């Protein structure tokens, strides 16, 4: 692809507020993107890959707001839901029966009473600890409630559906504003809950996470993904014409919405990460709560470091899963040997799933860098092509680095024997994580 064109000479498809742009406008946008970001190969490879795999087109004129941690995210989502006039669609892995969960349940019930249709998808495994009465209250109020792939053996039709979980976190309000990222509807963001931890890194406060608020044409793509899941799970019929309408320009960011599902050709988020890291020229900065990928992904990361790209990876110093904590650490040796810089976040459980590459390409979403997210779960990520947003992401990344302990090769070689044993056995079972 050269000068904003694909291999057959046509520019990539770009969607604006009024629909698909002409070839000439798309070509102009690609030219401006290359000039502004200086990351032509990275952006072109990403768009070419998505077109080849049948992924969604790039959308123009979006406004993206970075939301840091639960309280800020909850406040922004609450404000948007409170102002809803037509509908609210919520898709979440966890919806806890705690102070935060009850706040949102009350808010959704209030909006339903105001004739705003509320549609909710919750994951059966993620909400296993939430009592059925919690969701019955929502149903009784008129909210359409859908349980994703029920664990109940009497309800599930195929065994493989037990491993296919809906790990997405998505809220769409009136088809105009969307929220996505790593934040579940849970009170863990105001208080800690951890099991495994590095020495001196015990949890002291709520979880550290990242979310985004997006307005603009890309919201239609978020809405479409929600509606697809709703149909697949046999939810009550919805008049989709009421959910996807005319979009307005809201900002200057270019956004691509990636929804991945199980299946060799449906792992769009995995392929997106591989492509972006392979085409990085300057730096790759990754933040994830679990790092348990396959060999190809690890090789892609280490190859980038060996060719001179600055690769930094922030992981939790405290975790909600001891097995996942040590399974992630079992990959440290290969990463450190290649020159990857590793950091473990102190004091707070790190739950963010983000990346910023070469100061131009960013992603925020629900996808962990592990086999569950890449192979078995329904996940959702926003790819943002905007240097201002990338600057904000980089600032947040550096703040997390400052609040982390760097893992050096010397320090890693001196870790206790018991840690090595835990890493060995955790790696054996990492395929189940």
Predicted feature locations:
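N-terminal localization/anchoring segments of enzymes in phospholipid and broader phosphate metabolism
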Residues: 1-271, 275, 279, 303, ...
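A short glycine-/small-residue-rich loop at the edge of a beta-strand within enzyme catalytic domains
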Residues: 264, 288, 292, 319-326, ...
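A general structural signal for well-ordered alpha-helical packing
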Residues: 270, 277, 298, 311, ...
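Helical hairpin unit composed of two closely spaced alpha helices linked by a short loop
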Residues: 280, 290-312, 316-317, 321
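Histidine/acidic-residue-rich catalytic or RNA/ligand-binding cores of hydrolases
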Residues: 295-299, 325-327, 357, 377
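C-terminal structural cap/anchor segments
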Residues: 309, 313, 321-368
């Amino acid at each position: 692809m050269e000068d904003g064109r694909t291999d057959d000479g046509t520019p990539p498809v770009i969607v604006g507020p009024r629909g698909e742009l002409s070839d000439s406008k798309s070509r102009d946008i690609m030219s401006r993107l290359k000039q502004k970001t200086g990351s032509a190969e990275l952006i072109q490879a990403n768009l070419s890959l998505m077109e080849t795999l049948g992924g969604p087109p790039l959308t123009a004129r979006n406004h993206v707001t970075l939301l840091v941690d639960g309280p800020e995210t909850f406040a922004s989502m609450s404000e948007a839901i409170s102002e809803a006039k037509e509908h609210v669609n919520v898709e979440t892995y966890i919806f806890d029966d705690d102070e935060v969960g009850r706040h949102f349940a009350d808010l959704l019930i209030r909006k339903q009473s105001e004739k705003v249709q509320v549609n909710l998808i919750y994951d059966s495994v993620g909400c296993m600890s939430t009592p059925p009465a919690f969701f019955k209250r929502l149903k009784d109020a008129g909210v359409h409630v859908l349980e994703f792939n029920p664990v109940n053996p009497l309800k599930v039709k195929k065994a493989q559906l037990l491993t296919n979980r809906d790990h997405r976190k998505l809220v769409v309000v009136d088809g105009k504003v969307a929220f996505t990222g790593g934040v579940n509807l849970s009170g863990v963001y105001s208080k800690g809950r951890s099991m495994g931890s590095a020495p001196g890194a015990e949890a002291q406060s709520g979880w550290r996470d990242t979310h985004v608020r997006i307005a603009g044409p890309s919201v239609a793509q978020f809405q479409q993904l929600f509606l697809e899941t709703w149909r697949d799970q046999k939810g009550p019929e919805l008049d989709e014409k009421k959910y996807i309408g005319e979009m307005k320009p809201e900002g200057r960011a270019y956004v691509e919405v990636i929804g991945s599902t199980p299946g060799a050709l449906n792992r769009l988020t995995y392929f997106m990460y591989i492509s972006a890291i392979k085409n990085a020229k300057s730096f790759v900065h990754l933040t994830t709560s679990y790092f348990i990928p396959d060999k190809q992904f690890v090789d892609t990361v280490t190859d980038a470091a060996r060719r001179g790209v600055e690769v930094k990876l922030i992981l939790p110093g405290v975790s909600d899963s001891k097995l996942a904590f040590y399974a992630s650490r079992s990959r440290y040796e290969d990463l450190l040997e290649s020159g990857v810089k590793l950091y473990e976040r102190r004091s707070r459980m790190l739950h963010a799933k983000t990346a910023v590459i070469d100061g131009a390409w960013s992603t925020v979403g629900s996808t962990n860098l592990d086999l569950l997210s890449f192979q078995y779960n329904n996940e959702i990520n926003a790819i943002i092509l905007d240097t201002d947003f990338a600057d904000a992401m980089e600032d947040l990344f550096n703040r997390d680095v400052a609040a982390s302990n760097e893992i050096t090769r010397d320090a890693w070689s001196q870790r206790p024997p018991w840690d090595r044993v835990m890493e060995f056995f955790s790696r054996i079972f990492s395929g189940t994580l």
